[in-house]
Amino acid sequence: MARHDHQLHEGESLKTAARDRLTQQGEQWTEMRASVFDALASFDKPASAYDIAEAVSKAQGRRVAANSVYRILDLFVGANLARRVESANAYVANAHPDCLHDCIFLICDQCGQTVHIDDDSLSGGVRRAAKSAGFSAPRPVIEVRGTCGDCEKD
């Protein structure tokens, strides 16, 4: 795995890093965006827009539409605050929003746990293979399905 320095955030540190990243890109950190980010970060597995809309609705005591959440999630993905797990049509908060790396997800088929790893040599190999096939893949997404260590023990 390629070595690189980046700060992993969680809790308030993650929320602060996300807010700072978004505002540095000229976007506003609104109450709704903060609520969506809080809900997204609270999930320990990838969450769909519907899951997030339900969590925000409960927290705010009013219905929040999933299409509003989708728009915010698209903004978050573009700003590197969230990653989309393509095969699950779900999202995870990016624990290091100031670092740009390709998405490599390890997804447990049994419990749904999803781990994001960085391996620049692996994603670089995918990019090179794509290029040799005449295909451009500037930011490949790699999803590996299998069984996590906890489920493997069971």
Residue ranges and their predicted role:
Residues 4-37:
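Short alpha-helical segments that sit at the start of domains
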Residues 21, 38-43, 55:
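Short amphipathic alpha-helical elements of helix-turn-helix/winged-helix folds
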Residues 29-31, 43-48:
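Short capping segments at the starts of secondary-structure elements
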Residues 48-62:
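DNA-recognition alpha helix
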Residues 69-79:
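Basic amphipathic alpha-helical segments that dock to polyanions
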Residues 77-154:
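Non-DNA-binding regulatory cores of transcription-related proteins
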